[in-house]
């Protein structure tokens, strides 16, 4: 690790995009970072992060990222509101789960890498982009969505460095 990529810009940014899809515009970001890897710390970045987001209606969502998960590519998002719960869960090769006094969750590891997890999503995104181009319509997500995700990443970086929530309202 020679240069910090900043976990919030290179990993969490995708979760910010998904959270905005679920929650709408975010008005507050509170982030925490920690290090298990000394090289990443020395480069000025975190290798693990927790981010709490709040929208204008007061709905709160939590994102947890870690550059290395021994169980595979672990990514979850859950938003609970008065009318229900929306989840984005891990994709597994099997639905068999094991739970006992020592172990819980899936009997098999999670998919190993984001390219495995999102292969279909990337293909569908490219198809939708080409379709929008051919039809002369505005693609989604838009450049405005990308800018908002980056704005959240910058707010999370500031929050993790200062230890304080950042207001975006």
Spans of model-derived segments:
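Rossmann-like dinucleotide-binding domain that binds NAD(P)(H)
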Residues: 1-60, 66-71, 144
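A structural signal for well-ordered alpha-helical segments within the folded catalytic domains
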Residues: 13-20, 120-127, 144-151
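Structural signal for well-ordered, non-membrane alpha-helices
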Residues: 20, 27, 87, 130, ...
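C-terminal glycine/acidic-rich active-site capping loop/insertion
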Residues: 50, 76-144
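Short, ordered coil/turn segments that flank beta-strands lining enzyme active or ligand-binding pockets
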Residues: 56, 82, 161
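Short, mixed charged/polar active-site loops
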Residues: 58-60, 85, 165
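Glycine-rich Rossmann NAD(P)(H)-binding loop
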Residues: 64-68, 78-82, 169
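C-terminal helix-rich "cap/oligomerization" subdomain common to oxidoreductases
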Residues: 128-169
């Amino acid at each position: 690790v020679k240069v910090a990529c900043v976990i919030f810009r290179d990993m969490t940014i995708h979760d910010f995009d998904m959270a905005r899809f679920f929650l709408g515009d975010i008005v507050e970001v509170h982030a925490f970072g920690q290090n298990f890897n000394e090289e990443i710390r020395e480069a000025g970045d975190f290798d693990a992060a927790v981010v709490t987001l709040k929208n204008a209606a007061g709905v709160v969502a939590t994102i947890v990222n870690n550059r290395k998960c021994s169980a595979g590519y672990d990514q979850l998002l859950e938003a609970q509101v008065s009318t229900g719960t929306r989840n984005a869960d891990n994709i597994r090769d099997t639905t068999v789960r094991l739970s006992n006094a020592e172990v819980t969750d899936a009997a098999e590891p999670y998919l190993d890498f984001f390219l495995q997890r999102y292969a279909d999503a990337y293909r569908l995104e490219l198809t939708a982009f080409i379709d929008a181009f051919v039809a002369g319509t505005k693609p989604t997500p838009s450049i405005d969505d990308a800018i908002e995700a980056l704005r959240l990443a910058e707010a999370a970086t500031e929050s993790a460095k200062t230890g304080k929530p950042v207001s975006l309202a």
